[in-house]
A protein has these predicted regions:
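N-acyltransferase acceptor-side catalytic subdomain
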Residues: 2-484
Length: 484
């Protein structure tokens, strides 16, 4: 879970490597390779974010290209596969897609342990319905849909036309500055992601069919074609799965890596079991931090489903706004979003709250996946200061909950090297990028080669400083190495 203090403290070494402070230098690209900016052709698309009057729905439909047909053929090992036709189209709202059909692609019924709640229709529609991820906030939905000959949906891609780089957690502001310095427009751009959510997961969502690999290929081609038709600068697929990361490289997208901090469950039966895997000084420190919670007359509760009332969401929204107003400077999520989340996904939501004298003073929002607890947001009342409460609510309570629910891991969000000493180890995250300007594609590709080496070095250094005993780290090593 990202610490709100990141915005006001000295940037961490990791942030300097992968964040907006790391610049693409002018000598790394040549204007002679770029050509002149086609400002006239871009102007119409850019204006989408400046609508003032008129029928917005009609104008959105003008933007959306007509459906395209793709013929699917088998690979070399599938020579007997009958050619199939799929039609790929774009919709301006996820509400145009039946929830059951979207989720048939996003949720693998054969492997429920892989459920990613952020990819469900319920979560994404809550973002749109609440006015959080919509055209007015710079997130114009352009979701891509693949249908078979019978009109059944066999694949979808959550996609947005964006007028900025906020709420993404993969920093490309220096790329935008480089475009601007040569008179080119970086925005709008296409972004496949879960808005405001740095969680790894599938981005090309496929129904379980015998020809899903071919649908994947068709959808990637359609994404590239859409970028060309809209005449945007680029296409970005952020926080894809590791498998998609490799497949998208094979299809011409540039690769970028970052890092997060995750906790892993070694079949622990209790929090004390987990502590016994740590070096003695780290174990002692955590116990001391946890003792300070009851000593400050704080009571922790983990609420789920119907236990979370409307009043809880109103209070948590105050916590959230206190965090954004004092640290981030922008509230991406509306009050209505939290209420919709509770209504649509109550069984997948865990709200960890702290009470002081029977009054809610702080809270942490988590979502429950098939095998993972996802820590998302943290906040407290203004002027509230209880030492170690952030660590308790965001990290230790999450670990306890994961052990109780028999979940394999806790993903505690972006940034925060302080998580390492509390049992969260650095893991690799992924993103893929496609640029229509060949000169910039080459320059950014070269930049990413050097950045990747730096990020891998940082991950190795951070792992060496981990809190676990040496034999435990040896057990973790194969998994961690595979993720690099």
């Amino acid at each position: 879970m990202a610490s709100p203090a990141v915005a006001t403290r000295r940037p961490s070494p990791t942030f300097l490597v992968s964040g907006p402070h790391h610049r693409l230098r002018r000598h790394e690209y040549s204007p002679s390779k770029l050509g002149s900016p086609s400002s006239a052709s871009r102007l119409k698309v850019t204006a989408l974010f400046g609508w003032i009057k008129g029928d917005r729905v009609a104008r959105t439909r003008e933007l959306i290209p007509s459906a395209e047909s793709y013929t699917l053929t088998g690979s070399a090992s599938e020579v007997d596969m009958k050619p199939r036709e799929v039609s790929i189209s774009v919709v301006s709202s996820i509400m145009d897609i039946p929830p059951a059909e979207w989720d048939a692609c996003a949720v693998d019924s054969a492997e429920p342990e892989k459920l990613n709640p952020f990819l469900t229709h319920a979560f994404l529609s809550s973002l749109e319905e609440s006015g959080s991820a919509v055209k007015e906030t710079g997130w114009l939905p352009l979701h891509v849909v693949a249908r078979d000959e019978n009109g059944d949906i066999v694949g979808v891609v959550p996609l947005y036309l964006k007028s900025h780089s906020r709420g993404e957690f993969v920093f490309d502001q220096s790329w935008a500055e480089a475009y601007h310095s040569y008179g080119l427009e970086y925005y709008p751009k296409l972004q496949s992601c879960v808005p405001f959510t740095p969680v790894t997961g599938q981005r090309i969502l496929l129904r379980d069919t015998s020809y899903r690999d071919q649908v994947f290929d068709a959808l990637v081609k359609a994404l590239k074609n859409l970028a060309t038709k809209l005449n945007v600068s680029s296409l970005h697929i952020t926080f894809p799965s590791e498998g998609e990361f490799g497949n998208l490289k094979d299809r011409g997208l540039l690769q970028r890596i970052g890092l997060q901090y995750h906790w892993r469950n070694r079949n622990y039966k209790s929090f004390d079991d987990f502590l016994m895997d740590l070096k003695q000084p780290k174990r002692k420190n955590i116990r001391q931090e946890r003792k300070k919670i009851p000593a400050q007359n704080l009571k922790m509760k983990r609420l789920r489903g119907d236990e979370i009332k409307s009043s809880h969401w109103d209070t948590f929204y105050k916590f959230y706004r206190n965090t954004t107003d004092n640290h981030w400077g922008r509230a991406y999520l509306t009050r209505e979003f939290f209420h919709l989340l509770g209504e649509k996904m109550g069984d997948k939501v865990m709200l960890i709250v702290a009470e002081h004298d029977d009054k809610l003073v702080a809270g942490a929002l988590n979502l429950i996946g098939g095998d993972t607890l996802y820590g998302r947001l943290w906040g407290c009342l203004p002027d509230v200061h209880f030492p170690n409460l952030h660590f308790e609510a965001c990290y230790y309570q999450a670990i306890e909950a994961a052990i109780e629910l028999n979940l394999s891991r806790v993903e505690a969000g972006a940034q925060g090297e302080h998580k390492i000493q509390r049992g969260y180890l650095p893991v690799t995250t992924y993103s893929c990028h496609y640029f229509l300007e060949p000169g910039f594609a080459t320059a950014i590709g070269n930049f990413l080669v050097h950045e990747t080496a730096q990020v891998k070095h940082v991950i190795n250094v951070l792992r060496d400083s981990g809190p676990y005993k040496e034999d435990i780290m040896k057990e973790f090593a194969p998994q961690l190495d595979n993720e690099m």
